[in-house]
From Swiss-Prot:
Keywords: ATP-binding, Cytoplasm, Kinase, NAD, NADP, Nucleotide-binding, Transferase
Entry keyword annotation includes ATP-binding: yes
Protein name stated in the entry: NAD kinase
Active site residues according to the UniProt entry: 80 (proton acceptor)
Organism field: Acinetobacter baylyi (strain ATCC 33305 / BD413 / ADP1)
Taxonomy of the source species: Bacteria, Pseudomonadati, Pseudomonadota, Gammaproteobacteria, Moraxellales
Pfam families: NAD_kinase (PF01513), NAD_kinase_C (PF20143)
Compartmental location: Cytoplasm
GO MF, one example: NAD+ kinase activity
Family: Belongs to the NAD kinase family.
Residues annotated as binding NAD(+): 80-81, 85, 154-155, 165, 182, 184, 195-200, 254
Purpose: Involved in the regulation of the intracellular balance of NAD and NADP, and is a key enzyme in the biosynthesis of NADP. Catalyzes specifically the phosphorylation on 2'-hydroxyl of the adenosine moiety of NAD to yield NADP.
Gene3D superfamilies xref list: Probable inorganic polyphosphate/atp-NAD kinase, domain 1, Probable inorganic polyphosphate/atp-NAD kinase, domain 2
Length: 307
C-alpha cells in the first residue's frame, strides 16, 4: 500500500457522490457530505440514481458509467456491495474511490459516518493511502463464441442456482488439467474477495497487495478437495459437464447467467485496477480484527483485568 502519490491528489476539485438506495441514514450522510464539500468551494456531481434520493433541486448529475470521466474523486456512501457496484463502472476511468460505511462489515467502505468529514478533509488535502486492487474479468463461451462477459472486484462464482443438486465441472489452470469435481460450485476470488464469500467457504485470507487468486470449492464431494492459491497472472477455465441442473455463474453476486453442457467460463485478471483510497492510519490487520472479531476474548479479558 502506498502513501499519497496520485497526480490528482492536489486537484480533487470535482467530486462524485454515489449512495446506496432505500436507506435513510445514507441520505443523511450524503447531505452532510454534499453541504460540506460545497462549503469548501468544491464542485459536486451526483450519479443519476443517487440524485433521486436527496432533497436537492438543480444539482448536476451524470450516469454511473460516465461519472468517472467528469470527476477527480468518487465518494461512495453505503456498504461494500455499493462500492463493488460502483467499482465496476469506474475502474476503466482510473477514478479514485473512497467509501463511507453505511452497511454492515465495511471492509471496503471503511470510514465511519461519524468520522466522515474529518477523514475526507485529510484526503482532500492529499493525505491518504492508495490501495490498488485488481479485478477479474470473466467470459462465458460456447463453441468459441462469447455469450456473456463481466468484471468482478470480489469474485466469480460457479454455483447450482436454486437447486440443491451438485454440479459437475472441470478445472484447468494455464491450460493444465487440474481436476474434475462434483460440488456445489467454485469461488474464484481476488484478494479483495478473500474476506467475503470465499472466507465463508473456508478459503484463505489474502493480503490486498498479493498478486494471487484463490479457488475455493463449495462443499466438494471429495474431502481432499481444498482451496488452491494461484498466481495472479493465471488463466482459469471451467468446463461444464453433464448435470441434472443448469449451473450458473455470477460476478460479485450481482447477476447470474445459466450455463449449458460444454460451455466454458474463462477467468483472468482484468487489465485495470481500482484506485481505492484510505485515510491516514489505515491498517488491513486492524480491519480484520475489527470486522472479523479477532482478539475479542482477549480484549474482553484485558478489559476485565483493567477494571
Amino acid at each position: 500500500m502506498q502513501s499519497a502519490n496520485l497526480s490528482s491528489a492536489k486537484s480533487f476539485r470535482n467530486i462524485g457522490l454515489i449512495g446506496r438506495p432505500d436507506k435513510i441514514s445514507v441520505v443523511e450522510t450524503l447531505c452532510l457530505i454534499h453541504d460540506h464539500l460545497r462549503g469548501l468551494g468544491l464542485h459536486v456531481i451526483f450519479d443519476q440514481e443517487t440524485a433521486e434520493l436527496v432533497p436537492y433541486t438543480n444539482v448536476q448529475t451524470a450516469s454511473r458509467s460516465l461519472l468517472g470521466e467528469v470527476v477527480d474523486l468518487v465518494i461512495v456512501v453505503g456498504g461494500d456491495g455499493s462500492l463493488l457496484h460502483a467499482a465496476r463502472a469506474l475502474v476503466r476511468h482510473h477514478t479514485p474511490v473512497i467509501g463511507i460505511n453505511r452497511g454492515r462489515l465495511g471492509f471496503l467502505t471503511d470510514i465511519k459516518p461519524a468520522d466522515a468529514l474529518f477523514k475526507l478533509d485529510q484526503v482532500l488535502k492529499g493525505h491518504f493511502q492508495l490501495d490498488r486492487r485488481f479485478l477479474l474479468e470473466m467470459e462465458v463461451r460456447t463453441k468459441g463464441e462469447t455469450l456473456y462477459d463481466a468484471i468482478a472486484l470480489n469474485d466469480v462464482v460457479l454455483h447450482s442456482g436454486k437447486s440443491v443438486h451438485m454440479i459437475d465441472f472441470e478445472l484447468q489452470i494455464d491450460g493444465q488439467y487440474v481436476y474434475r469435481q462434483h460440488s456445489d460450485g467454485l469461488i474464484v476470488s481476488t484478494p479483495t474477495g478473500s474476506t467475503a464469500y470465499a472466507l465463508s467457504g473456508g478459503g484463505p485470507i489474502l493480503h490486498p497487495s498479493m498478486d494471487a487468486i484463490a479457488l475455493v470449492p463449495m462443499h466438494p464431494h471429495t474431502l481432499s478437495s481444498r482451496p488452491i492459491v494461484v498466481g495472479g497472472q493465471s488463466e482459469i477455465k471451467l468446463t461444464i459437464r453433464e448435470n441434472r441442473v443448469l449451473p450458473m455463474v455470477s460476478a460479485d453476486g450481482q447477476h447470474s447467467v445459466s450455463l449449458n453442457v460444454g460451455d466454458c467460463v474463462h477467468i483472468r485478471k482484468h487489465p485495470f485496477k481500482l484506485n481505492l483510497l484510505h485515510p491516514p492510519g489505515y491498517d488491513f490487520y486492524m480491519a480484520c480484527r475489527t470486522k472479523l472479531g479477532w482478539n475479542q476474548d482477549f480484549d474482553l479479558i484485558k478489559e476485565q483485568d483493567d477494571s
